[in-house]
Structure formats: C-alpha cells, structure tokens
Amino acid sequence: MTVLIHVLGSDIPHHNRTVLRFFNDALAATSEHAREFMVVGKDDGLSDSCPALSVQFFPGKKSLAEAAIAKAKANRQQRFFFHGQFNPKLWLALLSGGIKPSQFFWHIWGADLYELSSGLRYKLFYPLRRLAQKRVGCVFATRGDLSFFAKTHPKVRGELLYFPTRMDPSLNTMANDRQREGKMTILVGNSGDRSNDHIAALCAVHQQLGDTVKVVVPMGYPPNNEAYIEEVRQAGLELFSEENLQILSEKLEFDAYLALLRQCDLGYFIFARQQGIGTLCLLIQAGIPCVLNRENPFWQDMTEQHLPVLFTTDDLNEDIVREAQRQLASVDKNTIAFFSPNYLQGWQRALAIAAGEVA
C-alpha cells in the first residue's frame, strides 16, 4: 500500500510546528501513514525535533503544489492529507483533475473554509474553490464546521476531527483553587491577526461593561505587526483607561501564555468563523468561559460537550460571567472531546480513512 503523504501547503509556522510535533510524538510510532510530510517553510530545527518524521520543505506554495501534483499524476494510488488548505494551486489541481477526489483528504482549519476576505482576487477565486470543494474525497473538521460545509456540499463525506491543541491533561483541574472576585479581566482575541477584529471587540466589551474591567489583548503573533498593534492600542485607549488596557506585543512562551490565561475571567472572541480553538481549549481548561459570535459554529461543539456558551448578542455583566464560571467548574474536563488526549482517537480514525485502510 502507498504511504499517505501529509501536506502543510502554506507557511504558517506556529500551526505547522504544532502539527509536526503532534505527529512525531503521538502518531508516527504506531502508523506508517503518519510519517511523510511536505511543508511550505523553513526547517528551523523541525527535522531535528521530529526525528520520527520524513519532512520535505519547500520555499513557497507554488513549488510545493507542483511537487504534489506531479506525485499525484505519477501514481493515482497516492493519497494526500491536506492540513488546512490555503494553497490556491492545489484547489485548482483538484478542480481540473490534476489531483483526483480519491487522492484528496482535507482537515479544515476554519479560515480555509470561510469566504470573509474582501479583496478582488479572493472574490474571484472563492467560486472556483467552492467548486473544487465538491470534489474532496473526505473532509475532517469540528462539528460546527462540518455543519457549515454540509450546507453547500451535502454529498461530501465529513468526519469529526479536532486540531491537536498542545495541552497538559493534568491541568484540567487547575481552575479549582482559583478564587474569582473583584475587577474582571477579559482576554480579547486569540492573536494579533486582523481576523480577530480587535477594535470592534474592544468597543463591544466597553459598550457592555464600560471602563470597569481590565482587557488583555495578545498580539505577539504574527510578527511584523507593529502598525496594526498601534492602531488597536490607540483605539483601546479611547475606550479604556491606561491601567485597564494591556496590549501584549511580544510573543509569549507557552507557560507564560498559560499563566496569562489563568489571570482572566472571560475570553471574548468576535470573529464570525471557527478559529482560535487552541486558545478556547486552554481557557476552558482553566475554567474560564468564552463569549462567541453566533456566526462562529464552534458553539455547536461546545454545547455538545455541555459547556456554557455566551454570545456577543447576549447581555453581559459580572453576575452572568460568574454563573458561567460556576457552570464550567461543574464539567468533568477529562471527558471533553476536543481536549488532549481525547482527540487522539479521532486522528487515528482519520489516518485510517485517508489511507484507505477503512471504508
């Protein structure tokens, strides 16, 4: 049987590194279909830190796509597992037959599914991508994204799968010793990416709660984002006093990020799509409820796991937040499907499906 090839077709260092390390540590030892990768980006020590994997790096999207298409044409039994799919040339190859549906398996990351960019080239490309998506052999995604995808592509097979968020299961009870009282601290957004719509989120928090809370905005990723960070800072200072606004412009190490989250009482995410599942997982693990946009279908996954969900359209005050905290504290976090290690079973099944080992 031909070994499955995994494709990270865009240079997204943080996510790509997370996927590679997860496969190296959790999957490669038990499945030959978890070892072969094609990745856009620089090695930057990844080969050394993932010795169980065979990783081929490419300088750009085009060169990777050309190599993948050549492999697909040379051997029609070759199957590919695309993790996120932000590579237009690969979509066009699926649409034109360069890669066959039986060769194309896609794990939706969220941003690669939705059509939110307003640029002309995106608006021209979206209809073509939509046509190509009808030809995918199988999609893997969160419950909410599967529901969203099925509305336009009901005939494409869908399987539940969660991004392998880096988590320490021993911390599932870490919120139990935390006393929450006094001024609330609210985390706004999951990164410095513009998709977080930080300014609108800050306005929404201020409209609901005024300058009575502290807002923390993590913007250390992506790099070279200084102009936008300053734009958010100035807008924030028009709403909140300096002592109540904390803009984090430096990327935090994982342990420092966990410590930051533990200081928060609420996460506030205004984006109208599924994204930031890693931050959501870490907040929930710490006993911190989240406010989501109703257009973000991840609320379906949260309610399926009996987790409290607040919406941006709901009334928001301290009593409501404290009640959500109490509800979250009563949940057995060891049973949450999108937590580590529970998502591992989904990955093992996904590998078997993509490799053709199970129907």
UniProtKB/Swiss-Prot annotation:
An example GO BP is: enterobacterial common antigen biosynthetic process
Q: Where located?
A: Cell inner membrane
Report the Pfam families cross-referenced here: Glyco_transf_56 (PF07429)
Q: Which reaction does it catalyse?
A: beta-D-ManNAcA-(1->4)-alpha-D-GlcNAc-di-trans,octa-cis-undecaprenyl diphosphate + dTDP-4-acetamido-4,6-dideoxy-alpha-D-galactose = alpha-D-FucNAc4-(1->4)-beta-D-ManNAcA-(1->4)-D-GlcNAc-undecaprenyl diphosphate + dTDP + H(+)
Query: Mainly localized where?
Result: membrane
A single Gene Ontology MF term assigned here is: fucosyltransferase activity
The yes or no answer to whether the keyword Glycosyltransferase is present is: yes
Q: From what superkingdom does this record's organism come?
A: Bacteria
- Kindly state one GO CC term assigned in the UniProt record: plasma membrane
Known role: Catalyzes the synthesis of Und-PP-GlcNAc-ManNAcA-Fuc4NAc (Lipid III), the third lipid-linked intermediate involved in ECA synthesis.
To which protein family does this belong?
Answer: Belongs to the glycosyltransferase 56 family.
| Protein name listed in UniProt | TDP-N-acetylfucosamine:lipid II N-acetylfucosaminyltransferase
Species per Swiss-Prot/TrEMBL record:
Escherichia coli (strain SE11)
Q: Which gene encodes it?
A: wecF
